[in-house]
């Protein structure tokens, strides 16, 4: 039995890095990993623009303005967002009525908010002075020319898509998705469209694990079920592995009579990286490699399977895409109550709010899944340690 960190290290040492790219539509890049660094070709804004509704002025001509002694300027025109041209022959004591986002002509260097005026049409009274640059967005105030707006190996979010759209970019080069297969094992499993009979259960883990992978913006290209028979398992592994970057198997890794997955992997010439990790639930988790495909074999119990996948998958993903943002999201918080020692390193269903974490259920069976709906994280308890109320503990947040 090895520690979780050592097991993850053994997996990442054999995890290849994605170098292949593809071009996708801008909206389709959401959640994907950038395949190139992009620099701004256009400053934003690319013209001086008004920061609010009001009057474009020369700031010096508002100096000393008060309600009792306002500055009075001639309104020589108006500009709204989208207007591109304005000609003004008058050079002194004038103002332009203007809306937020509108182009500010040369020689005007500030905008007086309309609330500081009498809303005049031909002439406007200004009751407060402004300084040069006030409510005036200069060229490049948001994005400078040649500013980096997207780095290679960065996960693309909605804000980045907004910046790319500001540049008129409608297609993005991204790294190709990780190709993942999921194989659930067990003769007791039946497909969802079949009626249940005594001794049988629906193949729910298959869908839970597939949903987990899809939520991470990766591709499930094989979804299958296999019996516990070692010959059939070996045949199925040989068939599907070459198409995949990672194969996730579920069940068949413990020490029961029908737990034949380790045997099947050995028969096909696979390399076992580890089997059994100091963690609960999901102790019998196994990592292996067959040809170029990495295999993560998780527990057949639903909660244990989710814990195994959560604690291994994000590390593999971060390695595959060379993107640290994809790693496990963890935080040190305060334990709200005492936890008795556990022989193995333990991961509990928990809920963190405002820096404090509670167990939300008294049931911690690895076969139960419904009580995870009230949780937002896993609480870690080191092996053999009594955790007292107020202790600092690590939590790992659900990310799908």
Residue ranges and their predicted role:
Residues 2-4, 56-222, 378, 397-399:
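Short, glycine/charged-enriched hinge/interface segments at domain edges or termini
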Residues 1-67, 74, 325-345:
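Short, low-complexity N-terminal leaders and the immediately following helix N-cap/first helix
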Residues 29-43, 84-97, 287-288, 294:
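Short, hydrophobic/aliphatic alpha-helical segments
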């Amino acid at each position: 039995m090895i520690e979780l960190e050592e097991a993850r290290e053994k997996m990442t040492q054999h995890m290849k890095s994605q170098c292949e790219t593809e071009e996708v539509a801008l909206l389709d890049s959401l959640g994907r990993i950038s395949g190139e660094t992009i620099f701004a070709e256009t400053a934003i804004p690319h013209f001086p623009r008004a920061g609010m509704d009001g009057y474009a002025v020369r700031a010096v001509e508002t100096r000393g303005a008060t309600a009792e002694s306002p500055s009075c300027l001639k309104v020589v025109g108006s500009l709204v967002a989208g207007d591109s041209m304005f000609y003004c022959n008058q050079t002194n004591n004038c103002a332009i009525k203007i809306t937020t986002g509108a182009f500010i002509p040369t020689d005007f260097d500030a905008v007086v908010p309309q609330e500081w005026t009498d809303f005049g049409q031909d002439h406007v009274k200004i009751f407060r002075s402004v300084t040069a640059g006030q409510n005036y967005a200069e060229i490049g105030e948001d994005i400078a020319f040649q500013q980096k707006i997207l780095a290679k190996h960065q996960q693309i979010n909605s804000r980045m898509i907004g910046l790319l759209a500001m540049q008129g970019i409608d297609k993005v080069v991204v790294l190709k998705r990780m190709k993942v297969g999921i194989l659930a094992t067990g003769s007791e499993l039946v497909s969802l469209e079949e009626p249940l009979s005594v001794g049988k259960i629906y193949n729910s883990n298959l869908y839970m694990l597939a949903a987990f992978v899809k939520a991470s913006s990766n591709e499930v290209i094989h979804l299958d079920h296999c019996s516990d028979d070692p010959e059939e398992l070996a045949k199925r592994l040989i068939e599907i592995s070459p198409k995949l970057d990672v194969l996730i198997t579920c069940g068949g890794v413990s020490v029961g009579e029908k737990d034949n997955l380790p045997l099947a992997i050995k028969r096909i010439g696979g390399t076992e990286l580890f089997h059994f990790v100091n963690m609960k639930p999901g102790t019998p988790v196994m990592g292996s490699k067959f040809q170029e495909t990495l295999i993560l074999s998780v527990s057949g119990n639903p909660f244990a399977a989710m814990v195994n996948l959560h604690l291994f998958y994000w590390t593999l993903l971060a390695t595959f895409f060379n993107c640290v943002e994809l790693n496990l999201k963890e935080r040190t918080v305060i334990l709200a109550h005492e936890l008795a020692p556990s022989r193995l390193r333990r991961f509990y269903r928990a809920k963190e709010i405002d820096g404090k974490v509670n167990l939300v259920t008294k049931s911690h069976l690895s076969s139960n899944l419904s009580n995870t709906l009230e949780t937002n994280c896993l609480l870690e308890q080191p092996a053999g340690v009594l955790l007292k109320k107020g202790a600092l503990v690590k939590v790992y947040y659900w990310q799908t």
